[in-house]
């Protein structure tokens, strides 16, 4: 429940209040309204709802329909003139975040909040953190791959970082379920679209940065993408930063006045004696660790998670147990064919993560390597060039280009765009299942490998704006072993 008087105080303190318009009249103060629900979905609105108008696709008819079933007040950047009072603000998403916190009783102040940002590795690092904190605490997890608010039931999120109203509601649910910590991934879009406005994290972790999500509907430039990633540092009490990341110097200067730990190159927290399923750490996490996820980059993610948890009181024993217990669906999952060849299923969906994946596989598999991948339609268009230029440096690969969430684009046209940057022949098969069947048929012996990149554990393809059922790369690999 929230009163209109409280709404006005919060918005005025945030310098985000313009006025309330009722017909031809303008008000600076208002009273007599109490709201029992808050929503940005007009289909959920009724007489007791504080309704937010957000999004460029919002239509006046949505509001008119809500008014017809009893809606009596709304918050917006525009007066739609539908016969009820409107509270006008400069930024409705900003307002939505702060008012959601008040409505749900400020759960963000009662949970320990950990957030991860980076171009790659957010999900894996969040999983490491969840397993570490689960040893002695009761964490909730908000992840691209899986979300749990009670530690028992898991569901998939549609956004890396939910809309602020949904996010705060989930925090309240986690608190009601007796959770002590909340671990989440924070995308650059989360800051660009004010989904985490007003939140302060106990620990923020910056894993890495590389050009990605650059396109008409995401970030116009790399600078804009990088800036929005760095905002997590400004909104965290303590930070963990990968000192080996590109453009580290600006991040180092930005966090100088904060509590911080660096890990990786030229720091005291490094990895030595890196093996396929174990590593030794130096510095604050000094010791030997078992790990199920192969690849040095996964070991670095484990160190980042360990340092973050250490700041929240986790013991080294908890950190070791948590790292050893972590596996992630669709992240470096390995199957073995009847002929002994390995099949790697991984979510690698940009140039940097694909480069890391190739490096790990080529380190352990010395025979023929078949790579299957595609690029998403209508988003992240820069990835196509990144993939093509990277693959052009690996003429030893057998490459099959296929569909990966083509959306409104032709998957073969996307494949042609990737192939235009590759100087050796590649195969193009639009049907992903047929492409996987073909890829697995090309191996001959132990030492050979197939890499199924991009989809990870996703059991759908996005086609013409809809999620179409898809068995999943792992299930199809099992089918054709």
Curated annotation (Swiss-Prot):
Please write the reaction equations for the catalytic activity of this protein.
UDP-N-acetyl-alpha-D-muramoyl-L-alanyl-D-glutamate + L-lysine + ATP = UDP-N-acetyl-alpha-D-muramoyl-L-alanyl-gamma-D-glutamyl-L-lysine + ADP + phosphate + H(+)
Annotated GO MF terms:
ATP binding; magnesium ion binding; UDP-N-acetylmuramoyl-L-alanyl-D-glutamate-L-lysine ligase activity
Q: Which parts of the sequence form the motif L-lysine recognition motif?
A: 404-407
| Keyword match Protein biosynthesis | no
Task: Identify the pathway.
Answer: Cell wall biogenesis; peptidoglycan biosynthesis
Residue positions annotated to bind UDP-N-acetyl-alpha-D-muramoyl-L-alanyl-D-glutamate are: 42, 160-161, 187, 195
User: Any one cellular component term from GO for this entry?
Assistant: cytoplasm
N6-carboxylysine is carried by which residues? 229
Ordered alphabetically, the record's keywords are:
ATP-binding, Cell cycle, Cell division, Cell shape, Cell wall biogenesis/degradation, Cytoplasm, Ligase, Nucleotide-binding, Peptidoglycan synthesis
Give the EC number. 6.3.2.7
Q: Which residues bind ATP?
A: 118-124
Name assigned to this protein: UDP-N-acetylmuramoyl-L-alanyl-D-glutamate--L-lysine ligase
What PANTHER family does the entry give? MUR LIGASE FAMILY MEMBER, UDP-N-ACETYLMURAMOYL-L-ALANYL-D-GLUTAMATE--2,6-DIAMINOPIMELATE LIGASE MURE HOMOLOG, CHLOROPLASTIC
Primary localization class, coarse: cytoplasm
Q: Which family does it belong to?
A: Belongs to the MurCDEF family. MurE subfamily.
Q: What does this protein do?
A: Catalyzes the addition of L-lysine to the nucleotide precursor UDP-N-acetylmuramoyl-L-alanyl-D-glutamate (UMAG) in the biosynthesis of bacterial cell-wall peptidoglycan.
What does the UniProt entry say about where the protein is found? Cytoplasm
Q: What is one Gene Ontology biological process annotated in the Swiss-Prot or TrEMBL record? A: regulation of cell shape
Q: Please give the Gene3D superfamilies that the UniProt record associates with this protein.
A: Mur ligase, C-terminal domain, Mur-like, catalytic domain, MurE/MurF, N-terminal domain
One Pfam family recorded for the sequence? Mur_ligase_M
Q: Does the keyword Cell division apply?
A: yes
> PTM comment for this protein?
Carboxylation is probably crucial for Mg(2+) binding and, consequently, for the gamma-phosphate positioning of ATP.
């Amino acid at each position: 429940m929230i009163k209109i008087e409280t709404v006005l105080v919060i918005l005025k303190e945030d310098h985000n209040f313009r006025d309330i318009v009722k017909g031809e009249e303008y008000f600076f103060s208002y009273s007599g309204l109490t709201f029992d629900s808050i929503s940005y979905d007009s289909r959920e609105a009724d007489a007791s709802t504080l309704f937010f108008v957000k999004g460029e696709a919002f239509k006046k008819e949505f509001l008119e329909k809500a008014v017809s079933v009893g809606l009596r007040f709304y918050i917006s950047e525009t007066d739609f003139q539908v016969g009820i009072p409107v509270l006008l603000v400069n930024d409705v998403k900003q307002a939505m975040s702060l008012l959601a916190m008040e409505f749900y009783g400020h759960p963000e102040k009662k949970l320990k909040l950990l957030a991860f940002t980076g171009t790659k590795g957010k999900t894996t690092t969040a999983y490491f953190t969840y397993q570490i904190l689960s040893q002695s605490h009761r964490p909730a997890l908000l992840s691209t791959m899986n979300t749990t608010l009670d530690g028992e039931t898991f569901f998939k999120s549609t956004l890396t970082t939910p809309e602020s109203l949904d996010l705060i509601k989930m925090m309240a649910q986690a608190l009601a379920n007796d959770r002590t910590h909340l671990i989440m991934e924070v995308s650059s879009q989360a800051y660009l679209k004010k989904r985490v406005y007003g939140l302060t994290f106990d620990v923020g972790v910056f894993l890495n940065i590389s050009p990605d999500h650059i396109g008409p509907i995401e970030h116009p430039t790399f600078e804009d993408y990088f800036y929005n990633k760095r905002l997590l540092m400004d909104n965290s009490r303590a930070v963990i930063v990968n000192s080996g990341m590109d453009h580290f110097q600006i991040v180092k200067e930005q966090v100088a006045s904060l509590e911080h730990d660096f890990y990786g190159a030229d720091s005291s927290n490094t990895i030595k004696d890196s093996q396929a399923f174990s590593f030794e750490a130096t510095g604050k996490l000094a010791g030997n660790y078992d790990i199920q996820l192969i690849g040095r980059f996964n070991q670095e993610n484990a160190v980042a998670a360990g340092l973050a948890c250490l700041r929240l009181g986790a013991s080294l024993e908890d950190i070791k147990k948590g790292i050893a217990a972590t596996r992630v669906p669709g992240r470096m999952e390995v199957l073995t064919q009847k002929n002994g060849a390995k099949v790697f299923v991984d979510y690698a969906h940009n140039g940097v993560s694909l480069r890391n994946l190739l490096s790990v596989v080529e380190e352990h598999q010395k025979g023929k390597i078949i790579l299957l991948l595609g690029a998403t339609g209508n988003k992240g268009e820069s990835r196509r060039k990144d993939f093509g230029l990277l693959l052009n440096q690996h003429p030893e690969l057998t490459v099959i280009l296929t569909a990966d969430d083509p959306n409104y684009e032709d998957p073969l046209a996307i494949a042609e765009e990737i192939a235009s940057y590759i100087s050796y022949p590649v195969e193009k098969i639009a049907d992903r299942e047929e492409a996987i069947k073909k890829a697995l048929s090309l191996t001959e012996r132990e030492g050979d490998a197939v890499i199924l990149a991009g989809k990870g554990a996703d059991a759908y393809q996005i086609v013409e704006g809809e999620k179409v059922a898809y068995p999943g790369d792992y299930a199809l690999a099992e089918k054709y072993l």
